[in-house]
Curated annotation (Swiss-Prot):
<keyword id="KW-0175">Coiled coil</keyword>
<feature type="coiled-coil region">
    <location>
        <begin position="65"/>
        <end position="174"/>
    </location>
</feature>
<feature type="compositionally biased region" description="Low complexity">
    <location>
        <begin position="38"/>
        <end position="49"/>
    </location>
</feature>
<protein>
    <recommendedName>
        <fullName>Coiled-coil domain-containing protein 192</fullName>
    </recommendedName>
</protein>
<feature type="region of interest" description="Disordered">
    <location>
        <begin position="28"/>
        <end position="55"/>
    </location>
</feature>
<dbReference type="InterPro" id="IPR038817">
    <property type="entry name" value="CCDC192"/>
</dbReference>
<feature type="compositionally biased region" description="Basic and acidic residues">
    <location>
        <begin position="251"/>
        <end position="267"/>
    </location>
</feature>
<feature type="region of interest" description="Disordered">
    <location>
        <begin position="251"/>
        <end position="292"/>
    </location>
</feature>
<feature type="coiled-coil region">
    <location>
        <begin position="222"/>
        <end position="258"/>
    </location>
</feature>
Length: 292
């Protein structure tokens, strides 16, 4: 509220009260010739009118001041209502902002946790990658060994089949020669003639040896061939066992590699035992008819 003062009266001036609560003075200029007359004429009446004028001016001042005060109160009430509405809207906006801030803080905390988990995973991924690399190297080595063993086994099988076929042919030939000799001996015994010392078939096959020595040599040849066949069969069985063992190890490593979590590598890349590799030099040569 603006202060309202009652304007005083000065000598030679008149104060006027306006609606806005301010006082202004209006000076009146009187000529010098009329001053003495007017003062003498109005001296008596002015002294009697002063209290009445003061009452009227005070009443008018009180009425204007009251109206001005009421207008100010109404304007202040309107301003107060507007301020309350603005404060209410601001409080609502503040509550919404607080809720948004809490949600953002929760999102930030979740993102920080995810970032820490990713950092931890990257930090712990080094040993796992090394272990996977070592296992891959072991698997590749085993696969190469299995491939070499398979190739060697196939070659040994082919060679063994050839030797078996040759032995079967030689055995059939020896049996046929023995049957022919026995038939000749039986025939000569029935006819009563002495058995010939040499035969054309025996000369071509045995080089003219006596029948008794030739039969012993055939028997020894058959025994030696049977021994070689049994040795080769044992070697082939051993190669098959080694191949099956390597395949089991490869399957075990592949099963450990894919579904399970990373584990510590206890053995170096050379942890797996070396599989025995059989060469063709270990197999004894087959005695054929050309060596006889």
């Amino acid at each position: 509220m603006m202060p309202v003062d009652v304007c005083p009266r000065d000598r030679g001036s008149q104060w006027v009260w306006l609606e806005m609560g301010q006082c202004y003075s209006k000076k009146s200029v009187v000529p010098e010739s009329d001053t003495s007359e007017r003062s003498s004429m109005t001296s008596g009446s002015s002294e009697s009118d002063i209290p009445q004028e003061n009452k009227v001016s005070k009443a008018s001042l009180d009425t204007g001041q009251m109206a001005f005060t009421l207008a100010q109160l109404e304007s202040l009430e309107i301003c107060l209502k507007e301020a309350e509405e603005k404060a209410k809207a601001l409080s609502e906006q503040l509550s919404v902002s607080e809720g948004t801030k809490s949600k953002l803080l929760e999102q930030v905390s979740r993102l920080e946790e995810k970032l820490e988990a990713v950092d931890h995973k990257e930090a712990s991924g080094g040993p796992y990658e090394k272990m996977v690399l070592v296992k891959d190297q072991c698997i590749q080595k085993l696969q190469a060994e299995v491939k070499a063993s398979q190739e060697q086994l196939i070659a040994q099988k082919l060679k063994h089949e050839k030797k078996v076929k040759k032995l079967q042919t030689d055995l059939a030939t020896a049996n046929a020669i023995t049957v022919l000799e026995l038939n000749e001996k039986i025939k000569t015994l029935y006819e009563g003639k002495p058995a010939p010392r040499e035969d054309s078939l025996l000369e071509g096959f045995c080089g003219g040896l006596p029948p008794v020595e030739e039969g012993d040599r055939k028997i020894s040849l058959i025994m030696e061939l049977s021994t070689q066949v049994s040795l080769q069969t044992e070697r082939i069985t051993q190669l098959k066992e080694v191949l099956e063992e390597k395949e089991r190890k490869i399957q075990q490593l592949e099963a450990e590699r894919s579904p399970h979590p990373p584990q510590e590598v206890k053995d170096p890349p050379g942890c797996l035992p070396e599989a025995p590799v059989f060469s063709t030099h270990d197999i004894p040569p087959v005695v054929s008819d050309e060596n006889l």
